[in-house]
Amino acid sequence: GADFVFHCAANTSGAAVMARTPLVHVTPNVVMNTYLLEAAYEASVKKFIFISSGAAYPPTGDRPVEEEEMFNGDPEDVYFPVAWMKRYSEILCRTYATKLSVPMSTLVIRPSNIYGAYDKFDFDTSHVTAALIRRVVERHNPFEVWGTGEDIRDLIFIEDFIDGLMLAVKKCNFYDEMNICSGVGVTIKQILQTALLVDHFDNAHVQFNPDKPSTTPVRLMDNSRLKERLGFQPKISLSEGLGRAIQWYRKHPFAN
């Protein structure tokens, strides 16, 4: 049997779909997560790694949220159904690790906004960074950005995320929870300006549309546990990461 199961699959979409159909991701993900945990347990898997989400946290404003704060309050309304789906799946992970006579070690990973190669670039299902990257590569002009551009996110490049993930798998045992993030907040406007700069899209006429759906104004995550317990620090800067992601998508324009 398998020593490790990395449960990275999820039914996801962007802000527009979530605004139209708030419950669309609840049932598919709850069913999938429940069956995968059950199958892993029956197969005597040594460690089950569940990729949760930083969006499940309660709002903490401009203060980075820490791991132990997950259940300190309700998640934000815009994420409410999806966030509680993630929280329920985390509780299932904790149950398998701590409430059974024969436990299965589980690890809950809460990433910030991951970006890079093999992301979802379809506008209906992509998150904001991938959508911006696609518009940059396709040279949209005028360049429409949903929202005001002032929303703040924590971005982590996919290779940094994987490095942090593998370190957590190696060093965390029994049951644990870990934020994997950069610990640095950037605005959507800064992400866009960096992407335009690294790809030399100098004549872009950017139009911010505050009437279009967006999610939360600020989402920051604390990476102290990641640094102190695992000795991990992301290596890829925003400009390097966006440059590499843009080049990847340019070579794979149908990867939507």
Where are these regions (language model features)?
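Active-site beta-alpha turn of Rossmann-fold NAD(P)-dependent dehydrogenases/reductases
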Residues: A9-A10, I49-S53, R110-S112, G149, ...
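C-terminal substrate-binding subdomain of Rossmann-fold SDR/epimerase-dehydratase oxidoreductases
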Residues: E138-N256
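NAD(P)-dependent short-chain dehydrogenase/reductase
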Residues: G61-P64, E68, I91-K170, G183-G185, ...
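NAD(P)H-binding glycine-rich loop region in Rossmannoid oxidoreductase-like domains
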Residues: G1-N29, A39-E42
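Active-site helix of classical SDR
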Residues: P81, M85-Y88
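Short beta->alpha connector loops of Rossmann-like oxidoreductase domains
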Residues: T12-G14, Y57-P58, G116
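Conserved Rossmann-fold NAD(P)-dependent oxidoreductase catalytic core, especially the SDR/UDP-sugar
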Residues: H7, T34-Y79, K99, L107
